[in-house]
Regions:
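Globular "head" domains of long coiled-coil molecular machines
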Residues: 1-267
């Protein structure tokens, strides 16, 4: 299960883990639905969606727009995940609504109920690294601490724009570790990730068409994440097998932290 406040990049992280655009990323597109995203064992080129009606070959338009006739809180999507390693087990990511939506206070109720009542192997709590330690985060973290008893991984996204010499990924991790301890989390596991870099890298690796802006951002991220501090895999203490290619896409995937994160998730 993945939870976060809005603007943390939760949908982008899910798109990066799946390696396809299956979730909306605009804040104003959020709906009060729980998305169950299932890994298929084979790549057959189809994405299915069950949202009141079953679509065996859901188009991007169908995936990006919820069916108004669905009077439940659940939407199910199935596709083959594009991962660095072969996934030989059943995997389902449960995507919950952002809890601090100003448009719909019901989002918090749905997410809180999910955290309390849905059984899962792991909870991922995602922070917005550009706006960390907010009152909204503290409120939601307190709820998670009091109502979820399972394993938690904390991720800090959006630290790519930190200024060298002014901001520090390492310092942010250390500070948030201490803050989580103060809230009652014992020995919290906390890691950085660049969800957007990982998403763009996977799309490029699988020859998906990028917009002109995305192509420019991909090039910029390849350069930026080569810097030692922004090579996020070092913070996971995982050994990543190298798969070099000429355009540096594989290295960007490693530097983004997504490969080390996938190792953590799929070892459970």
């Amino acid at each position: 299960m993945i939870t976060a406040n809005m603007s943390a990049g939760k949908s982008t992280l899910l798109n990066a883990l799946v390696g396809k655009k299956i979730n909306k990323t605009l804040n104003d597109s959020c709906t009060a639905k729980i998305h169950y995203i299932h890994n298929k064992f084979i790549e057959d080129g189809y994405i299915y969606e069950y949202d009141h009606e079953l679509e065996l070959n859901a188009s991007n338009e169908i995936l990006m727009n919820d069916n108004e006739e669905n009077d439940t809180t659940d939407i199910h999507v199935g596709t083959k995940f594009r991962s660095w390693q072969e996934i030989d087990k059943r995997v389902c990511f449960i995507d919950t609504p952002g809890v601090n939506s100003s448009m719909d206070k019901g989002h918090r109720e749905i997410t809180d109920d999910s955290i309390t009542n849905i059984e899962c192997d792991l909870l991922i709590y995602l922070f917005n690294g550009e706006n960390i330690g907010t009152d909204d985060d503290i409120r939601h973290l307190s709820y998670v601490h009091d109502h979820y008893m399972g394993k938690i991984i904390f991720l800090i996204n959006r630290v790519d724009n930190y200024k060298t010499g002014t901001d520090s990924v390492k310092d942010t991790l250390e500070k948030e570790y201490k803050d989580l301890q103060k809230l009652g989390f014992k020995n919290p596991e906390i890691y950085p990730v660049s969800a957007y870099a990982a998403y763009l890298a996977k799309m490029a690796l699988h020859k998906e068409k990028l917009s002109e802006d995305e192509a420019e951002e991909l090039s910029a991220l390849k350069r930026r994440l080569k810097r030692p501090e922004f090579s996020y895999e070092q913070y996971y203490k995982k050994t990543i097998p190298r798969k070099e290619n000429e355009d540096g896409i594989s290295q960007l995937l490693i530097n983004s932290g997504i490969i080390a994160l996938e190792q953590l998730l799929y070892e459970l």
